[in-house]
């Protein structure tokens, strides 16, 4: 089974990031901010304006407090748990919210993959991984050139601006390996790839026969330029995937259009994303499985993440979360998040796997304590 994904970087960043194969893919081993303590404080407290980051009008951030977010309209979640969760908010300043929107699948799928170079990555026994590599040109994205912002600030994360969606973080591969080892079943399930970035987790669910897959990332550019091309590149006919007569870098594959209807794409902050999907005219069916990797690095986001699980996870569903034990420089980590969850008494957590290579990492399952 071929597994392809698009990873977009700028030429001048290729030496700055860690290449896996000829600079085609970057895998960061720590998700630690390479900024000073004073810079970290400034990033947490700074208010981002459209003028400061040269954002166009259609990418304006919504600056409003968490208290103004609309309450959940769903009735499936335990009411007592929801009430408890709302009454236990974290201390400290809440990040500004970015409006959520849905991204339509382009009609011209062939054009989306034009001038893309497909390369196969080594190291996976049961899944063949390939890269669709493109170059991000500044002139094409003058308003939201988040890669340049990240580079100029010497940081992989810019709070409220860029949340790391252009990198493939290490724990993503841990979770992919767990899927294979634990024989995780996706067939017939509705799946959310939360904080999707390149979309590898959701693409795995897509290939595994999920009935519906939603991809969400904070940045709209990540969805348009990374996630969408990856999904299209991976929705190919099996006979073309197995064609070895042409080298990977030359092969042009026809999109499996009949399967793409199962995929939907969203950008924006988590609470705004919840409001968007729950406010649709059609009755929203909650997710059987939420997949997320390296999303608990910042304690300021824990309340929104917890509320997202509460509002969108089906009563018998589960979350599979991959994370490092601790994120130096931003303060989050597994034990702090587990404590946060335990205090709210809504979900229970279970450690499925511990990876001791390099920085200690975990695969965690999250389910409702009282699903009834």
From Swiss-Prot:
Q: What does this protein do?
A: Protein-L-histidine N-tele-methyltransferase that specifically monomethylates RPL3, thereby regulating translation elongation. Histidine methylation of RPL3 regulates translation elongation by slowing ribosome traversal on tyrosine codons: slower elongation provides enough time for proper folding of synthesized proteins and prevents cellular aggregation of tyrosine-rich proteins.
Molecular functions (GO terms): heat shock protein binding; protein-L-histidine N-tele-methyltransferase activity
Gene for this chain: METTL18
Residues annotated with Tele-methylhistidine modification = 154
Q: Which residues form the signal peptide?
A: none
Where, per the database record, does this protein carry Phosphoserine?
72, 77
Question: What EC numbers are recorded for this enzyme?
Answer: 2.1.1.85
Disordered: where is this region? Answer: 30-55, 68-103
Q: What is this protein called?
A: Histidine protein methyltransferase 1 homolog
In this chain, composition skew of type Basic and acidic residues spans: 39-49
Enzymatic class:
transferase
- Stretches of Polar residues bias are at 70-87
Give its localization.
Cytoplasm, Cytosol; Nucleus; Nucleus, Nucleolus
UniProt similarity note: Belongs to the methyltransferase superfamily. METTL18 family.
Biological-process GO terms, alphabetical: peptidyl-lysine monomethylation; regulation of ribosome biogenesis; regulation of rRNA processing; regulation of translation; regulation of translational elongation
Q: Which Gene3D superfamilies match?
A: Vaccinia Virus protein VP39 (3.40.50.150)
Q: How does it associate, per the subunit comment? A: Interacts with GRWD1 and members of the heat shock protein 90 and 70 families; these proteins may possibly be methylation substrates for the enzyme.
Domain of life from the UniProt record:
Eukaryota
Q: Which reaction does it catalyse?
A: L-histidyl-[protein] + S-adenosyl-L-methionine = N(tele)-methyl-L-histidyl-[protein] + S-adenosyl-L-homocysteine + H(+)
Cited InterPro entries: Methyltransf_16, SAM-dependent_MTases_sf
Q: How is it modified after translation?
A: Monomethylated at His-154 through automethylation. Automethylation at His-154 positively regulates the methyltransferase activity toward RPL3. Probably methylated on other residues.
Q: According to the UniProt entry, where does the motif Nuclear localization signal sit in this chain? A: 247-253
Q: Cross-referenced CDD domains, in alphabetical order?
A: AdoMet_MTases (cd02440)
GO CC term, one of those recorded: cytosol
Annotated positions binding S-adenosyl-L-methionine: 168-172, 195, 216-218, 268-270, 293
Keywords assigned by UniProt, alphabetized = Cytoplasm, Methylation, Methyltransferase, Nucleus, Phosphoprotein, S-adenosyl-L-methionine, Transferase
């Amino acid at each position: 089974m071929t597994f392809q994904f698009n990873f977009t970087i700028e030429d001048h960043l290729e030496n700055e990031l860690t290449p896996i194969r000829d600079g085609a893919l970057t895998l960061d081993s720590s998700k630690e901010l390479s900024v000073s303590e004073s810079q970290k404080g400034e990033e947490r407290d700074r208010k981002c304006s459209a003028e400061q980051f040269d954002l166009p009008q259609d990418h304006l951030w919504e600056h409003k407090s968490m208290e103004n977010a609309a309450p959940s309209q769903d009735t499936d979640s335990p009411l007592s748990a929801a009430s408890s969760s709302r009454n236990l908010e974290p201390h400290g300043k809440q990040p500004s919210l970015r409006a959520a929107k849905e991204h339509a699948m382009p009609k011209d799928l062939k054009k989306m993959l034009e001038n893309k170079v497909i390369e196969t990555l080594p190291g996976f026994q049961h899944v063949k991984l390939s890269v669709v590599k493109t170059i991000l040109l500044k002139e094409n994205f003058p308003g939201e050139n988040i890669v340049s912002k990240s580079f100029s600030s010497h940081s992989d994360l810019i709070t409220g601006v860029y949340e790391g969606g252009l990198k493939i973080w290490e724990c993503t591969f841990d979770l992919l390996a767990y899927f294979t080892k634990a024989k995780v079943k996706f067939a017939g399930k509705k799946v959310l790839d939360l904080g999707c970035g390149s979309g590898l987790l959701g693409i795995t669910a897509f290939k595994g026969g999920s009935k519906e897959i939603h991809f969400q990332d904070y940045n709209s550019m990540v969805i348009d330029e990374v996630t969408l091309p990856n999904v299209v590149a991976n929705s190919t006919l099996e006979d073309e995937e197995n064609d070895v007569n042409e080298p990977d870098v030359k092969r042009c594959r026809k999109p499996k259009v009949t399967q793409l209807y199962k995929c939907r794409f969203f950008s924006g902050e988590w609470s705004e994303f919840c409001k968007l999907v729950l406010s649709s005219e059609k009755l929203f069916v909650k997710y059987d499985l939420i997949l997320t990797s390296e999303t608990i690095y910042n304690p300021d986001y824990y309340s929104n993440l917890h509320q997202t699980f509460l509002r969108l996870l089906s009563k018998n569903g589960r979350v599979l979360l991959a994370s490092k034990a601790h994120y130096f420089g931003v303060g989050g980590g597994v034990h702090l998040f587990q404590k946060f969850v335990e205090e709210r008494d809504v979900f229970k957590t279970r450690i499925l796997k511990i990876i001791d290579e390099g920085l200690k990492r975990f695969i965690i399952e999250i389910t409702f304590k009282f699903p009834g």
